[in-house]
């Protein structure tokens, strides 16, 4: 009797027995939205609009670059929110917090698309880098308009929902260390 815990292996064996050959039609493959510059820009705009803080009496706003990267990473992956909440609630209980952070950091550290989008937005004048901070640039109002338009047209409901959940999770500096 075949083992029921290995359905993928069973399917692979059946396909091999029947001499099945995969056919890939590139025109029918959909690229992942996670690598789309416009999508990532929209997510950065939503996160920046919600979490960036005012800089003195100016209209400029800023956010820690590590915080922005973590928040947009989690916005794109809302299934990680329960783990982040547990990580945050664990506080300085290092063993418990470390276990949660390792699972999240594994994917987070290899996510270079965010860095590329931020570099693009800096080159366009939408954002500026200032030491460890990301600051709204001379054309930073464009990001605010993107976020406003997304909300007005009720787009990206999942992402906006994740951002609202993130607003209730305390992201500490300890959580951001080493990022």
Model regions and ranges:
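Short, hydrophobic/amphipathic alpha-helical patches that form generic packing surfaces
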Residues: 39-53, 70-76, 120-123
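Accessory beta->alpha helical hairpin/"wing" motif in late/C-terminal subdomains of nucleic-acid enzymes
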Residues: 128-164
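Leucine-rich, amphipathic alpha-helical/linker segments
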Residues: 157-179
């Amino acid at each position: 009797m075949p083992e029921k815990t290995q359905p993928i292996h069973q399917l692979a064996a059946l396909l091999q027995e029947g001499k099945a050959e995969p056919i890939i039609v590139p025109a029918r493959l959909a690229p992942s939205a996670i690598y789309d510059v416009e999508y990532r820009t929209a997510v950065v705009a939503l996160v920046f609009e919600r979490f960036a803080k005012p800089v003195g009496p100016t209209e400029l706003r800023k956010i820690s670059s590590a915080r922005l990267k973590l928040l947009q990473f989690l916005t794109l992956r809302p299934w990680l929110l329960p783990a982040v909440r547990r990580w945050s609630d664990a506080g300085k209980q290092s063993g418990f917090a470390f276990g949660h952070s390792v699972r999240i950091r594994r994917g987070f550290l290899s996510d270079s698309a965010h860095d590329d989008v931020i570099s693009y937005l800096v080159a366009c004048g939408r954002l500026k880098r200032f030491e460890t901070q990301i600051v709204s640039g001379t054309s930073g109002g464009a990001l605010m308009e993107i976020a406003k338009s997304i909300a007005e047209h009720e787009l990206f409901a999942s992402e906006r929902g994740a951002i609202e959940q993130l607003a209730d999770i305390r992201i500490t500096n300890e959580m951001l260390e080493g990022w």
